[in-house]
Amino acid sequence: EFSLHLVAASQYFDAAVGANDRAEYDVDFLLSGAASYFLSDDFGSAKVLCSEYFARMNPETNEPQKIMGNFLGYLLLNRDFHISEDTPDGEQVCRSLLAYYNTGEGAEEIQSLLSEYRKAIYENDAPMEIYYVDILCAIVMVALSKSSWILLPRYSELDQSLWSDYLKSPKAPRMLWPAQQLIGEKGVLRGQSAIVQLPTGVGKTKSIELVIRSSFASGRATTAIIVAPLRALCNEIANDMISAFGDKVLVNQFSDVLEEDFSLDLFLSLKSKILICTPEKLSYIIHHQADFLDEIGLYIFDEGHMFDDGSRGAIYELLISEIRSHISLEEQLILLSAVLSNAEQIQKWLLGEAGVLASDPQIKATPKTIGFASQTKDIHYYSDDSAQEDFYVPRSIEVIALQKRPREKKQRYFPELTDAKDIAIYYANKLCKNGAAAIFANRTSTVLTVINRIIELRNRGHDLAEIKGNSDGEEMNRLAQLMSSYYGEQHPYTIACHLGVLPHYSNLPNGLRLAVEYAFRNKAVRLV
């Protein structure tokens, strides 16, 4: 009933912070916006505003606001939940919440204590305290209804004791996001094979982790395999799984080299195992080790929309089809994808009557607004609705004359408006101060062309300080040394490292590629 109003309120508070015209209220806007997003089930956007709230929070906040902010930080950001000692009632509420998330017990007591606390705040008759205590009550009720202590045992049909150790750990989710509730409601945590459609940024990685944990805890599988079509994605998934499971589970990422660099001896380990590889590697393995599939109890295929990829989609599709024909219906197979136009057809083809389609159009990625700033001082906002969108070219590029080389007569400029790579470099230099930027090339050879152009611009005196200045100098020096050991000190890749620019493509040596991805992920480099 109130969902549309909550969405409007959250967008208003979000925009109010961006307007920068009432800075003294920004902390209230941020916390109110985070709460509005939270109550409308947009936990990703709530997390963003909550993080910004803690960067700007004022220690002089009232107690209900303080408790609410700390509780949201605890739920969304895995921050410590600090006990408020401003009033006895507030302290009791905090302690009861912390006790619940440590044991899974005492939900009824929380509601009773919260009611008493709300009554005491109303008696004080302080408007802002009343405003925040009402929102706090709503947030606590929603959080308890989506609590992992309640939903994971229910969805997996496993006793709470099998989840207890995990839920007491700091890495466990305190509540399930809509995406995780979706896979639970569809029976995926009970072993149901499924086609799962989830947009980016809604907790897909955590969903994969929960599926694997439920499969291991129930005894349905001791080995899970995750197949992802990109080597970089395999690296990212492997890091996430190692972080999530630690040394309790053996996480093994196969190389993408098509050779017999694996052994079935890895299945002799008593630990549960998570294997990660590309489709090409798995296809190679099962053609050389026919018994390999006998050891797998859970198959997870990521990025299912890659079926439509012209060069690799057929390999991926044939691999999944071959595996489906070799395994029994008891073994669980999950296909994850952000976008599948024919999801129902794929479900019938791949899973038949044994599987389900898990999809919910209400689960949306974090909304974004794109605006083009122009020399006319107007801002043109991009619309996803093609019926409302007009053709628009922003007049925001300033062309600059470059220094001439010795004996060079022709004046050269940057950017050349007919050169796509110049436009890309120009905007990357302008935008990288706001976060990492990537220039996408359609061929590997273009990577070197772009880097040579950046080096040429530096040599002609063009200011590229934004790229270098916003990168981590020490990390870039280390990467330059590593690049030098592969290519030599005078190679453009090595020189580019000193300018804050790194190459990345499939044939880059694996050690370099991993180092580049690590630097990009940890915000040490601003342009790839």
Where are each of the predicted segments found?
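N-terminal helicase ATP-binding lobe
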Residues: 1-528
